[in-house]
From Swiss-Prot:
Function: Voltage-gated channel that enables the transfer of anions such as iodide, chloride, bromide and fluoride which may function in counter-ion conductance and participates in Golgi acidification.
The protein, known as: Golgi pH regulator
Secretion signal span: none
Its membrane topology: Multi-pass membrane protein
GO BP terms: intracellular pH reduction; protein transport
Organism of this sequence: Xenopus laevis (African clawed frog)
Keyword set includes Ion transport: yes
UniProt entry tagged with the keyword Hydrolase: no
Record text on subunit structure and interactions: Homotrimer.
Alphabetical list of PANTHER family matching this protein: G-PROTEIN COUPLED RECEPTOR 89-RELATED, GOLGI PH REGULATOR A-RELATED
Glycosylation: residue positions: N67, N180
Family the entry assigns: Belongs to the Golgi pH regulator (TC 1.A.38) family.
Length: 455
């Protein structure tokens, strides 16, 4: 294919990715909000399009599509654009919309937006000082300076999510961790909730009755006769006010208890549904996956520990290494190079699809959890920043899963980064995240029955 035809193919694919990002923005993130800033929508869609294009170019590297020079050009162009968006455009607009929400700074929002962006750039640049992420010969304006710093943030984010996911996935899927919940437990808790609601209604009726009596009494004594009449009205209303305050305090405490009882009741219903679901064929399948992921989690933690202790980074991609070990052990004739290419392609494809799907699901949940009509623009831009850094760092790590002959152009485009550092850093953060998640889930699982008994 000629360079022009290759470029047309890349532009068409980028337009498709842009359209998908636009639809995701409209139908998932902003479907419940009327006010939309089109610049936010464009920035999010552009970030999504160029992030997906990097994964597309990885697939093209393995399949050998497009000319080598075309792939190199589009790798370079794509990387420059995504870095420009992540380092300059998105941080500036985040500061701009933050300042726009502050009325006192509304007239000088451009000045304060630039100030926020310069502050971001200072800390972003200082981020590279403590890490051995660059070769000493790179200049201060080289593209490697930006990639290296974006990679540190992205790899840290990936490792945190991977560590928590490796622990939370088996905990969620396995029926072993489900506590036993009966209909009697649910009915008892619902009865307590109804009793609490009745007490709240009763006390609020008392408050309304006391206020009505105070209002009627106030009309009768609206014109107290003389000095002693005023003293009498003040002294008689003081105990009533104290009584009202005490009843209101009791109502507040009961409402807090009702919220806890409601959440606990909803949790028991969800657990009961999970128990029933675990008895179905699909539930048993996910239970099996839970055991598989448990083994995977233990293996990943073990290998991360080994890599950290012995300062070890694999030189061969995992697929080729695994096939070589199997072939040598069984002593059979096998074309390792041919099959490692195809299996690596399938593996990388699975990693790419699951990464994009998982990140989009996580972004949607996160957005609905913390967004509001005023903060939604800022939240979307933050998600675009996280998404772009996540995908750039994914390329740094996926590179190790590819056979050596497919890494050439990617390595040339990314520059002489210290790739081994990123893999070691991933192992360190993954280990910390996984162990912290195990401790957190253990405490939460242990506390749940105690909380249920207390309620």
């Amino acid at each position: 294919m000629s360079f022009f035809a290759d470029s047309v193919l890349m532009v068409i694919s980028q337009l498709l990715f842009f359209g998908f990002g636009w639809l995701f923005f409209m139908r998932q993130l902003f479907k419940d909000y009327e006010v939309r800033q089109y610049v936010v929508q464009v920035v999010f869609s552009v970030t999504f399009a160029f992030s997906c294009t990097m994964f597309e170019l990885i697939i093209f590297e393995i399949l050998g599509l497009l000319n080598s020079s075309s792939r190199y050009f589009h790798w370079k162009l794509n990387l420059c654009v995504i870095l420009l968006v992540l380092v300059f455009v998105v941080p500036f607009y985040i500061g701009y919309f933050v300042v726009s929400n502050i009325r006192l700074l509304h007239r000088q929002r451009l000045l304060f937006s630039c100030t926020i962006w310069l502050t971001f750039m200072y800390f972003f640049w200082k981020l590279g000082d403590p890490f051995p992420i660059l070769s000493p010969k790179h200049g201060i304006l080289s593209i490697e300076q930006l990639i290296s710093r974006v990679g540190v943030i992205g790899v840290t984010l990936m490792a945190l999510l991977s560590g928590f996911g490796a622990v939370n996935c088996p905990y969620t899927y396995m029926s072993y961790f489900l506590r036993n919940v009966t209909d009697a437990d649910i009915l008892a808790l619902e009865r307590r909730l109804l009793q609490t609601m009745d007490m709240i209604v009763s006390k609020k009726k008392r408050i309304a009755a006391v206020r009505r009596n105070m209002f009627q009494r106030g009309e009768e004594h609206s014109k107290p006769s003389g000095f002693w009449g005023m003293i009498k009205s003040v002294t008689s209303s003081a105990p009533v006010s104290e009584n009202l305050y005490q009843i209101q305090q009791e109502v507040d405490a009961l409402e807090e208890l009702s919220r806890q009882l409601f959440l606990e009741t909803a949790d028991l219903h969800a657990t009961k549904e999970r128990i029933e679901y675990s008895k179905t064929f699909q539930g048993k399948y996910f239970n099996f996956l839970g055991y598989f992921f448990s083994i995977y989690c233990v293996w990943k933690i073990f290998m991360a520990t080994i890599n950290i202790v012995f300062d070890r980074v694999g030189k061969t991609d995992p697929v080729t290494r695994g096939i070589e070990i199997t072939v040598n052990y069984l002593g059979i004739q096998f074309d390792v190079k041919f099959w490692s290419q195809h299996i690596s392609f399938i593996l990388v494809g699975i990693i790419i699809v699951t990464s994009i799907r998982g990140l989009l699901i996580t972004l949607t949940k996160f957005f609905y959890a913390i967004s509001s009509s005023k903060s939604s623009n800022v939240i979307v831009l933050l998600l675009a920043q996280i998404m772009g850094m996540y995908f750039v760092s994914s390329v740094l790590l996926i590179r190790m899963s590819m056979p050596l002959e497919y890494r050439t152009i990617i390595t040339e485009v990314l520059g002489e980064l210290q790739f081994n550092f990123y893999h070691r850093w991933f192992d360190v953060i993954f280990l910390v995240s996984a162990l912290s998640s195990i401790l957190f889930l253990y405490l939460a699982h242990k506390q749940a029955p105690e909380k249920h008994m207390a309620l």
